[in-house]
Amino acid sequence: KWGGALFAVGAWIKVWPAGLLLAALVALRARGAVLAAAVAVSMLVVATGIALGGASALLTPITEQTGRGLQVESPVSTVWLWAAAAGEWAASVYYDQGILTWQVVGDGSQLAADLMTPLLALVVLVIVSLGIVAARRGVDEVELLPVLSLALVMALITVNKVGSPQFATWIAVPVVLGLAWQAWGGPSFRVPAVLALVIAGLTQLVYPVLYGSLLALDPRMLVVLSARNLLYVVLLAWAVWHLIALCSRPRVVSSGVAAGAAAPASEGASS
């Protein structure tokens, strides 16, 4: 219950914890309590916003997202950064005064920006569907929650036209959860932990250490950023692969259901 409340508070502050909340609603048996706590927090936030005259701003984190271009650090922007360095596709890096961030523009960049939000929604829907299948097949929440949380968080990072150094810190939550739950029979999270550390190191190089070189399209920094973004994709693929593996397991039948099914068979044998 308290986890649902905390995830809801986090989602209203920074959006991405909504992925953790969604994973909890799918994977945990106590999803009713999680949902009730999240709804209670959300109602309190909405009521407070309306009371303070900020009703029109409640959904700005989502509505403002749709109008953005391709931010420099997002994985999808990598192609246009290399094109800008090569003098192709009329690509260039510019500073958007409206939202105070560096973005990339070039042939096809606006189409890519327009497609990223619906693509992100589709990827999240697919991941949640896999999680529901795994839960219905009786996969234990100790195994399902860390993998599903990581998959959703990595989708929010990887399939996103927005990029930021803080995104690398998001990975810590599902990775720490996975490492902690290994002791209770959860899957090994050594690979995600190592990848997360490498991603953090590369991100530190990108920003703030050598960000000026990146904006100047220094090929060495483009290699660093490309490697970091590729590792985002690898980590997403790892999580989805393990999620599919959980879905592929034979269905687990609870002991109560199994006992109920066995009773008629034993009665028939005795008669």
Predicted regions located by residue number:
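N-terminal leader/capping segments at the start of a protein or of a new domain
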Residues: 65-68
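Extracytoplasmic catalytic/substrate-binding loops of multi-pass membrane glycan-assembly enzymes
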Residues: 70-76
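Multi-pass membrane glycosyltransferase architecture that uses lipid-linked
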Residues: 1-63, 112-271
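Short helix-capping/linker segments at secondary-structure and domain boundaries
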Residues: 87-89, 182-183
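Juxtamembrane membrane-water interface segments that cap and precede transmembrane helices
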Residues: 88-111
